[in-house]
Amino acid sequence: MEHLLLFLSCLSMLVSIAFQSVLLPLILHLFSFFLLSFLSFLHFRSFSANNFKHHSLFLVPKRRSFSISVLPAAAPSSPSSNSFLFPSLSHYFYSLRDTTMVKLTESAVYIRTKCSLENVKKLNLWGCGIDDIQVCEKMSLLEVLSLSVNEVKSLAPLQHCKNLKEVYLRKNCLESLDELEYLKELPNLRTLWIDENPCVGEGGQEYRRKVIRVLPNLTKLDDKPVTTTDHQEAIEDSIPECDMHNSHYSARSNRSNSIDLMSRSLYVGPTVVDRIVQPQLLHFGDTSDEERTTYPARSFSVEVPGLPLTEDHTTVYLDSAPQSHIGSRHNLMSQSMYGTLCGTLAEEPSSADGEDDWNDFSIEEDRVMVQMPLAASHRMYQSMHEGMVIEMKRPPVYGRSVSMPRRRATNLTTRASSMSPAREQRLTKIMSAVSVLLDELDTDGLRQVVDEAQRRLKKQR
């Protein structure tokens, strides 16, 4: 067709030159145009006849005019190859990943799950570039959540998902393990995968111990089961050795330094009976021959006026090494009785040659003497002795600390060991008679009796 048009143009030029006329070339040009139009019509007709079976005519609207387009009548392409007709999930986010924040929306969740936020139980958002999951706080029934290969930085919205069982957060942007604190209140959480996050670092056992310490209910961490050994290491790592040592030392020092007020002093009216400066352990109970041999200077017997001595509950032991007798029990009554007994003994000045007998013991020598009626003293001794007998039958526990001079303990031991059963019975009868007579005395008379008893005690020593 193109060659024919060129041929007619050249022919009209030659005719105009040969005949030196203007009208003839115009006629030739008109003839050429009509001939070309006719040939074009024939060509289009033959083309339509051959291809009408394979093509269809579609009207495509363009504003107010219409144009005819010829489109293939074959089946439409698949969604994977035609992103315009079938948009992907990323078109439902607010913006592109490379430019601004990508926020998870309700419409995106609905496209994936075909249900409302309140009814979602499983949600897979792998590789969507999401960095805002605030909408997850509305998913109260959510059990399985996959957010791997995203840009999540905070787990705060997940603290409202109380039914969460599995959370997958691999390859995200978690900067600190403190974000796991938001998952502590999830009772059903058993599987967690946070590997390849900045907070993991190089990983290893230390990282696993930290995670297990925060979430002890986990059974699977980073696609690895959590064993009993992991739990033990997490517990041991949570209690530093220095803290354990300080706690043990503090408890031991409190036990050794605490002295009960009743063991330090006994008040009869305004008068202070006894004051103990440095405590030592006081033990009441049975003793064996081996113990008496090991501590001969620390063992003595206490003679209680008005009460018979028994072999089971009248022996007193002093020991300056608490570690060898941990577990012995000392009740308040026995300690108060000991303080009262020491207070009723007459004081003697310490001599230069007797200073070695006291060693590390320290008791005030200018202590006020006890002014107490003997009847009241007898009743007090009796009640204290009964309480001491009951206490001796109980299991041993930690006791209090008191002290007493070794020299006096030795003297008491000598006198108590030399007392015969007949003398004990006679002394009991005498004390009973004295108690009856003391009931007839007034306060002044009782004081005179106490003074006389103290003077005689000094003479006996």
From Swiss-Prot:
Q: What are the record keywords, sorted?
A: Leucine-rich repeat, Repeat
Q: Give the matching InterPro entries.
A: Leu-rich_rpt (IPR001611), Leu-rich_rpt_4 (IPR025875), LRR_dom_sf (IPR032675), U2A'_phosphoprotein32A_C (IPR003603)
Tell me one Pfam family matched here: LRR_4
Keyword Repeat attached:
yes
Q: Where are the LRR repeats?
A: 119-140, 141-162, 163-184
Report the residue ranges that make up the LRRCT domain in this protein.
197-237
According to its UniProt entry, one GO biological process term is: cytoskeleton organization
Q: Does the keyword Transmembrane helix apply?
A: no
Could you say which residues form the signal peptide?
none
Protein name as it appears in the record: Uncharacterized protein F09G8.5
